[in-house]
A protein has these predicted regions:
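N-terminal leader/linker segments that initiate helical-solenoid repeat arrays
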Residues: 20-65, 69, 83-86, 315
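Structural motif corresponding to the intra-repeat A-B loop/turn of tetratricopeptide repeats
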Residues: 32, 61, 95, 139, ...
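Canonical positions in the second alpha-helix
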Residues: 41, 45, 74, 117-118, ...
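TPR alpha-solenoid repeat register
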Residues: 50, 84, 128, 165-167, ...
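Residue-level recognition of tetratricopeptide repeat
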Residues: 56, 90, 97, 134, ...
Length: 315
């Protein structure tokens, strides 16, 4: 996931695990990465659940206009569904990040409204509160942002998930350029997390961002050593190594483990894993393998423009 209004200033948001509702077993899975199949299957449907999943499929391939269209329809059909408001808010937020300033202001307000509605409908929905907190941290006050508002969310989230509360406080500290407090809050999140692996990866991302490669590698090793880690940890580890420019062979190994795990998740669908693998090969100067991975990504998600552009570059 790219840094956007929804992403933390210390590049942590891309790694925070999303405790979202999974699609029903009879529905196609975004995690499998076959976005083309999902879009073909769902495009003719008019029920709210299908429209929400369709919106998320478009969101995954960064077609945010289509994601907004489907997401708005889902919300209109089921206005009391917190999850649908969350995903519509995300689509608005990503669109705002690439829009012209006039449009971005309107979209940002819509983002905030959807996140707030998601929280209002389900006060215990930790991920909605986390996304709203990110908005408050990143948005200017004229658009409803504010660190005090984010701090209030951290207090509210602590009732349900202490680790996420510390993560929000880390975002705030980072925005204040208080690196020691950022690191401390991330370390506290690790201590109280049910799944410490994702928070070790947050810490690894922080170390990478601040040119502490040895600490980064130690944090990655700790994440991968957790007995209850999700397979996504391998994907995230590869992403941090790629961004740091370090240990590409290990990053390749981690991505292959993830792709072979049979436990992929929506935040890291297969087509994105192939795309990241292609990026790593390209950085290594291995254009044949890079091209093969970009083609594998496009075979699952033909509308994913970054892979198309990368393939043209690698061939």
């Amino acid at each position: 996931m790219r840094p956007t209004l929804r992403c933390a200033s210390v590049c942590l948001a891309a790694i925070l695990g999303c405790a979202l509702l999974a699609p029903a077993a009879t529905e196609p899975s975004i995690a499998s990465g076959n976005i083309d199949d999902i879009i073909r299957t769902l495009s003719g449907r008019t029920d709210a659940g299908s429209l929400n999943l369709l919106s998320r499929a478009y969101y995954a391939i960064e077609q945010f206009d289509n994601a907004i269209t489907a997401g708005e329809k889902a919300v209109n059909l089921q206005p009391n569904n917190s999850l649908y408001h969350l995903w519509l808010g995300r689509a608005y937020g990503e669109k705002a990040a690439i829009a012209n300033p006039f449009s971005a202001a309107s979209l940002a307000r819509k983002t905030k409204n959807e996140f707030e509605q998601a929280v209002k409908l389900d006060p215990a929905f930790v991920q909605a509160r986390a996304d709203l907190s990110e908005y408050f941290v990143e948005a200017p006050s004229i658009m409803g942002g504010g660190l005090d508002k984010a701090r209030d969310q951290a207090v509210q989230v602590a009732k349900y998930d202490e680790a996420t509360s510390h993560w929000i406080l880390a975002l705030i500290a980072s925005k204040d350029k208080n690196l020691a407090e950022t690191e401390s809050q991330l370390q506290q999140a690790i201590k109280v997390a049910k799944d410490p692996s994702q928070y070790w990866m947050n810490l690894a991302s922080f170390y990478s961002h601040h040119a502490r490669p040895d600490d980064m590698q130690k944090a990655i090793s700790q994440a991968l050593a957790q007995p209850n880690k999700s397979a996504e940890t391998y994907y995230n580890a590869a992403g941090v190594l790629f961004q740091s420019g370090k240990n590409f062979p290990a990053a390749i190994e981690y991505l292959k483990k993830y792709l072979n795990s049979g436990a992929m998740v929506e935040d890291a669908p297969a087509f994105r894993a192939h795309y990241l693998l292609g990026q790593i090969y390209e950085k290594m100067g291995n254009k044949p393998d890079a091209s093969a991975e970009y083609k594998a990504s496009l075979a699952l998600a033909s509308g994913f423009a970054p892979a198309s552009k990368a393939l043209g570059r690698a061939q």
